[in-house]
Amino acid sequence: MERALIRQEISKACKRLALTQQVVTMCELEATPRQEEFLYQVLSQELAYRERLRRERLLKRAAFPVRKTLDDYEWTALRLPAALPAEDVTSCNFVRMKRNLILYGPVGTGKTHLAIALGVAACEAGLETRFFTAASLATKLDEARRSGNLEKLLQSIDRAELVILDEWGYLPLEKEQAQLLFQLISSCYERRSLIITTNLSLIHI
């Protein structure tokens, strides 16, 4: 790698690591090309290490019941609308564009697997994600409301760029729970992406 390019990469790495540009200045004044190459490798390894830690934190906060990947998903059961290319789904572009997915079909068609796999992919892409079953989230919201902690819970969810609601319609909800859940969904509109899995037909969602 050319020396000028190495210095550019060192400068970028310093910014990402929140280091001052004094490192770059010292390189330009005192370091040999070999020393600059070594420093570049050290900074690159530190960046990679921090990125791995960040992904693990995102995966932990997402609270997936299990971890699934897109590699072992059976794609033959999936039909996407023409307006949503598969690339936008697998690359998580739909999250960046704040678009929503409703995965519906009979039990055993891999809806939850795909939802979790997309959530894992989003975390690996650095996107804050939260996973809930619809019933568990409704219960959490209701309990938080009763205990006066609703705002705190909503703020936690508000940090997410992707919210996954699994098993929509699987269990009946109390009126207050349903209202809180619908309010949350409404607040997500054009602000973050939702993935909802359900075995209900669209007219019943």
Per-segment meaning from a language model:
Residues D71-V89:
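N-terminal pre-Walker A segment at the start of P-loop NTPase domains
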Residues I203-I205:
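Conserved small/polar residues in nucleotide/adenosyl-binding loops
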Residues T109-L127:
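Walker A/P-loop
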Residues R16-P65:
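Interdomain "pre-motor" coupling segment immediately N-terminal to P-loop NTPase/helicase cores
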Residues N100-T112:
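Walker A/P-loop nucleotide-binding motif
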Residues S91-K98:
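Phosphate-binding P-loop
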Residues L127-E128, R159-L162, E190-I196:
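Loop/turn-to-beta-strand initiation segments
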Residues A82-L84, R130-I157:
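Short glycine-rich substrate-engagement loop in P-loop NTPases that contacts/grips substrate
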